[in-house]
Amino acid sequence: MAPDAVARTAVDQGAPGFYDSGLAPTPYMGWNTYYGLGAPTEKEVRSVADRLVSSGLRDSGYDIVWLDGGWQADNPRDAQGHLVANPDRFPSGIPALVSYLHKRGLRAGIYTDGGTYDGGKSCGLGSRGYYDQDARQFANWKIDAIKVDFLCGIGAKLDPGPAYKEFSDAVAKSGRRMLLNLCNPLTDDWGLPHTPEQDAHNTYVYAPAIADSWRTGTDIAWGTPSPGEWPNILRNMDANAWHPEAQGPGHYNDPDYLIPMRKMTDGSYELTQEESTSQFVMWAEMGSPLVLGSDPRTLSDSMLATLRNPEIIAVDQDPLAVQGVRVATDSAGDVYSKVLQGRGQRAVVLLNRSDQPAQRTVHFSDTGLGGPVRVRDLRARTDRGTHTGSYTVEVPAHGTAFLKLTGADVLPGTDLGVTATASPAVASGGAAFFRGPHGSLVEKADGRARDLGGPVHGGILGQPAVYASAGGRIDVFVRGDDSRAYRRIYADGRWGHWQSLGGQLADAPSVAFTDPAHWTLLATGTDGTVVQRGPASGWSSLGAPGDRQVYGRPSAAVDAQGRVHVAVRGAADDVWTRSRDTAGEWSGWTSLGGTVSGSPTLVAVGDTVLLYARAADYTLWQQRYAEGAWQGWSKRQEFPSAAFDGALGAVAGPEGAVDAVFRGVDGHVYRTRIK
């Protein structure tokens, strides 16, 4: 594997671990019965399955045939509590249908609800009280994917997070790997009183650790095709765009199904072909699951050809699984950019939300590209030449232009010419430290790279923490391959041996360093809380904001008054801080808000403390602590969207500046000065 390929697929060793069934390394694809058939029948499902094969949709990736509600009997359980298929609609039973699908190279999906069955008032079946039993039954039926609705859960006013966690655990114990999709559709659109925890827009907080995918909003349409559907496409798309940072390989935001060209009773279409294509394009740009809701037997040859377009599908299936984000907007629409695998490549959508054709422009600098940029039209599968600065095209009403741009990544600072596989750190004086291509700790100083190995099996995990002090001394703290903390010291012109600091860490440590005899090491423990230790003390817990597990690596700094500041990425991808005064007393946790896609970085500069974090749209933002308070978020304009991965490494520079290092989108380590 080429070094840049290694770099692009590497990530920081984050905590907690994201869910990964192994069944969806890229967004899954298929067809679901709900919007196309309503209550399905065995005969119709087999007919659609055959059409998926004959139309080429299966070979394009649409390989899951997913039964939604209505497959179950009117009384969904037998005397032993087992789920039962409707004998009139599925006379051969579910296992026979699964076998039929498997023989045709298709996978089988099924539906249940996470709540308790209430006799049909809210849902047609419910698995609460039967999670283990139902998961085993689905496994015995050789089901490949499960959709878990929450209609009866909503009716009972349950908190979906704990319920879905129980169901996820049941699937893990079932003896069969099955893709898990969570479908809590409750939003304010329902007009029902509910807590924030019960809202679909909150699912991203817990779902990435327990499921392959999760709905990010309410249903995109009614079961019966209806006029005025275009605003609902935009509504679900915009809701899905709120938390792109929650998505990654094996775990995906789900804005609901594709509903191309469903025909209404008057013979007209719910969505035009252009609107249907715009939905398909935007779902691909967001790296969403591509599940058809329309009946493919009713689609025109031209619509089917669009849905099979290999260049559009390739954007959705890009192995980085980055969700494209908005990088520019105006009164007519938006520009979205998505980083693709390989250097200098972006997928860009020019969306026209308006009711009239409009000239739409992408400025290459908004995508982090410079130099001559090659433009390819993915919808037309045609090259559009090489351009400098920008590209403009007319886009129809409710339409899209879908482009692949290939140019040079433009990143702030100086390329150090070395590849990192996690976020780097920097010491005063300029030496950079990072996890190299082979997993070992590497030092880059004075133009030379030196491999420092690692404490266990020659490797480290995640971002190192470093501090330079008087006499040329450098202290380095790392998480070893055994998840313990280690320290190594450079003094008197040579590196000493690794020293174990114990602990069991879920992410790399950071250090609040006063001098070699006075420091506090902080990390995320295996229980998701922040843990600390000093030179002589053992590990102890600082808890976590709201008693919910934190993501990633805490950051720490000591200010000019000797206070220790700690910042973490919370469960809701917001930033929280707390501080320890010179008497050793810790404050409570304080929310700084924000929505971040990487661990925060703290650095003390003069009388202030600066906090940097990569935002949800992959840009860099900062806060300043001065006069006893944090001053609010501001954007660093020198960092375009997706310029870097993970977290900055930072140290105080001259005249109030910050010297920073980061792992660029190309996998290289860069050094820059932030003023």
Protein language model features and the residues they cover:
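N-terminal module-boundary/linker segments of secreted carbohydrate-active enzymes
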Residues: 2-46, 51, 178, 187, ...
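Structural recognition of the beta-strand scaffold that forms the well-ordered cores
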Residues: 27-33, 61-68, 107-112, 144-149, ...
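Aromatic-lined carbohydrate-binding/catalytic grooves of carbohydrate-active enzymes
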Residues: 48, 52-157
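Glycan-recognition surfaces
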Residues: 130, 179-295
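Catalytic cores of secreted or luminal carbohydrate-active enzymes
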Residues: 281-326, 400-408
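Carbohydrate-binding surface patches
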Residues: 283-286, 291-293, 329-369
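C-terminal beta-strand-rich structural cap/linker in extracellular carbohydrate-active enzymes
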Residues: 387-411
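A structural motif
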Residues: 409-675
